[in-house]
């Protein structure tokens, strides 16, 4: 049973978002996603300044098992990337909801948040997949 923090919003494609204030949202992949992928070896992050639309593939997580696209859960501009992942991609495995965040987006359309799931909805979607 994966850990699903209640303060986050989730995409069905297993990304999470956390409001950091001032329209800035941190984005990462869920504990469930990192469990499926296995040990991370490289994370290809978007460049700061990249404008993404909700649903766009914007990063790649490479693990010992596979390379998997990561999708933008909300639209906006990438304003920061987690540079610690360059030398320590395993943070995505060990701390997917904290130190293993991927990038931050300045949201351009708040209504994108309405399309995301709360923790209960995401947990239910995981149980349907089992």
Swiss-Prot record:
Residues 24-106 form the Lipoyl-binding domain. One of its GO terms (biological process) is glycine decarboxylation via glycine cleavage system. It comes from the Bacteria. Keywords: Lipoyl. The modification N6-lipoyllysine is found at residue 65. Disulfide bonds: none annotated. InterPro entries: 2-oxoA_DH_lipoyl-BS, Biotin_lipoyl, GCV_H, GCV_H/Fam206, GCV_H_sub, Single_hybrid_motif. Binds 1 lipoyl cofactor covalently. Gene3D superfamilies: 2.40.50.100. One of its GO terms (cellular component) is glycine cleavage complex. Transmembrane segments: none annotated. The keyword Transmembrane does not apply. Its cofactor is (R)-lipoate. Belongs to the GcvH family. The glycine cleavage system is composed of four proteins: P, T, L and H. The glycine cleavage system catalyzes the degradation of glycine. The H protein shuttles the methylamine group of glycine from the P protein to the T protein. This is Glycine cleavage system H protein. The gene is gcvH.
